[in-house]
């Protein structure tokens, strides 16, 4: 998923962190509910210009989000006002779609209130989500079709020093409060910042769009824009990034905590419980999640053993994995081979989708490698496109050291990130005409990542993937990987596991995973829990529907019931699917 966009969602929800007053009586200026949704959406676009860019709204493409303390305080007041107003509307006065939208708006604000004290510290300094990566991802996602588009890119590069100053002020707040990130995370971010400082503007990904202009832009404009971009890079970006490096190295790192557990911070247990709820949209405790993870690992490994037997292998699951990884052709020979195969899988799957779905998105899909400055520490992910299709959805594939990556798990990965996974779900959501605009942009990890993992299992119902025992084994290995996360994330942040303990558990139950995975859980407590918990809820709903409907069950109707409302918290998803299919 696109990390810059996800961080914007987190920030937007976080600004609801003030006490809630009793809703006031309706006055002459009180807007109706639909108008409130529109006002809230327009406010978010103006307050979070990067979100507007992601959603294909160009009016704020020359700006960055104002992260000064004054702006953050003002947004808190604004969000309190929005919550007061949505609480005014009694559910009995609303139709069903309005009830869902009002409940979702209230959920966004209330959940943000609970998690706000902990979100900034885990988002500002991170090898996956840090502000340094947001700058690059936002520029990469900007349109580059007109002179104005290019001028917007230049304007944003020129304003990077302000972005840096405001974020460094937030890091100073963390130091004062004793809520810094672990040193291991800071060092990873430092490595990325250093790699992003290129000797010349021509070498920087920030200026990629200036290497090839559309034919409609005149030569004189091309020369001017290139000169302006080069000047912005050397006079604004480079000094700001060096300032970031110096601050992280000399000021923040010495204050970074040596412990990796969130519970080592003041109020750490409360923080972790809040983040579990925030990311998973459930009220499960860390202990419950840990036990469930252990149960799921054992169950899935039993299934994996059965697949190995079908392949004629009589040894252990671990031995079969080793055989698949070390056999001739078991790993990739090049980055291009990986990308070509991923594209082929998506092309094979697409014609099969009408068997499982009534509605397919129009948004185009592309596959590209993760950039070299991030590939050593960033997992494969999906970046959403724009509703008008001018920017496709992108599967950003990690092709780092291809000779060390196994082949048998890639089909599941492609299904997760593209179709019928993230691309199908997110693009469909963005194209739902009846949804208020704020809902088209909403992401909740429990639903979105749960759908991605559920989508991996749908390969068994398609006719073009998992044709060999090895690739079905790979799908189960991918599912087990998400179950292992339940154990490891809670092990680190609730049970006090060391980095070495976490890696040892991974090597025992999901061999081949690197320390980069462990470091991801250290940097983002609770987020990795969303995949398995969301998938289990969707599978539970499907079993209930199959049991209740019997021969009348149609998987296309089930998928439509899950996807037709866009992203929902899991409890609200349960209610909506049960109502749509008339099941208990």
Kindly label every feature range from the protein language model.
Residues 1, 17-18, 38, 411:
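A general, composition-driven signal for non-globular sequence regions
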Residues 1-12:
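Bacterial N-terminal signal peptides that target proteins for export
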Residues 12-13, 50:
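A periodicity- and composition-biased signal for non-globular, repetitive helical segments
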Residues 13-22:
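Hydrophobic h-region of N-terminal signal peptides that target proteins for export
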Residues 24-584:
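N-terminal maturation segment of proteins
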């Amino acid at each position: 998923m696109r990390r810059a966009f996800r961080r914007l969602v987190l920030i937007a929800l976080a600004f609801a962190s003030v006490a809630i007053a009793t809703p006031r009586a309706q006055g002459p200026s009180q807007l109706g509910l639909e108008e409130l949704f529109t006002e809230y959406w327009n406010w978010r676009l103006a307050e979070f210009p990067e979100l507007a860019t992601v959603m294909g709204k160009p009016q704020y493409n020359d700006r960055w989000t104002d992260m000064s303390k004054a702006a953050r305080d003002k947004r808190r007041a604004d969000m309190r006002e929005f919550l007061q107003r949505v609480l005014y509307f009694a559910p009995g006065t609303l139709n069903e779609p309005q009830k869902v939208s009002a409940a979702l708006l209230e959920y966004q604000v209330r959940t943000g209130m609970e998690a706000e004290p902990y979100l900034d510290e885990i988002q500002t300094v991170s090898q996956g989500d840090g502000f340094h990566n947001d700058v690059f991802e936002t520029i990469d996602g900007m349109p580059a079709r007109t002179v104005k588009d290019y001028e917007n890119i230049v304007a944003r590069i020129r304003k990077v020093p302000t972005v840096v100053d405001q974020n460094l002020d937030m890091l100073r707040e963390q130091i004062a409060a004793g809520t810094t990130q672990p040193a291991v995370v800071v060092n990873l971010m430092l490595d990325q910042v250093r790699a992003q400082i290129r000797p010349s503007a021509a070498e920087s990904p920030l200026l990629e769009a200036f290497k090839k202009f559309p034919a409609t832009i005149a030569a004189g404009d091309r020369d001017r824009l290139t000169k302006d971009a080069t000047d912005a890079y050397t006079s604004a970006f480079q000094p700001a990034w060096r300032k970031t490096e110096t601050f992280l190295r000399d000021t923040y790192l010495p204050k970074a905590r040596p412990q990796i557990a969130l519970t080592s911070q003041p109020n750490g247990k409360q923080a972790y419980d809040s983040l579990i709820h925030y990311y998973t949209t459930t009220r499960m405790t860390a202990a419950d999640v840990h036990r469930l993870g252990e149960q799921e690992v054992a169950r899935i490994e039993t299934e994996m053993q059965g697949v190995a037997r079908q392949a004629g292998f009589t040894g252990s699951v671990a031995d079969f994995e080793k055989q698949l990884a070390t056999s001739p052709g078991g790993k990739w020979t090049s980055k291009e081979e990986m990308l070509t195969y991923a594209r082929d899988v998506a092309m094979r799957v697409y014609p099969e989708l009408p068997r499982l779905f009534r509605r397919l998105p129009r948004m185009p899909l592309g596959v590209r490698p993760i950039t070299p400055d991030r590939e050593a520490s960033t997992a494969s992910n999906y970046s959403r496109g724009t509703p008008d299709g001018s920017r496709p959805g992108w599967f950003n594939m990690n092709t780092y050291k291809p000779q060390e990556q196994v082949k048998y798990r890639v089909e599941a990965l492609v299904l997760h990130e593209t179709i019928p996974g993230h691309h199908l779900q997110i693009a469909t959501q963005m194209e739902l005409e009846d949804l208020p605009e704020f809902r088209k942009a909403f992401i909740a990890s429990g639903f979105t990542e749960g759908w991605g993992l559920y989508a991996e299992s749908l390969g068994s119902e398609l006719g073009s993937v998992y044709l060999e025992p090895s690739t079905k084994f790979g799908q189960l290995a991918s599912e087990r990987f998400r179950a292992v996360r339940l154990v490891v994330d809670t092990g680190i942040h609730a049970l006090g596991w060391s980095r070495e303990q976490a890696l040892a558990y991974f090597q025992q139950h999901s061999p081949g995973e690197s320390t980069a995975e462990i470091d991801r859980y250290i940097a983002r407590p609770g987020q990795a829990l969303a995949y398995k918990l969301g998938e289990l809820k969707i599978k539970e709903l499907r079993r209930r529907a199959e049991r209740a409907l019997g021969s009348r069950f149609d998987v296309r109707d089930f998928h439509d019931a899950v996807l037709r409302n866009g992203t929902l918290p899991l409890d609200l998803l349960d209610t909506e699917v049960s109502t749509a299919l008339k099941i208990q």
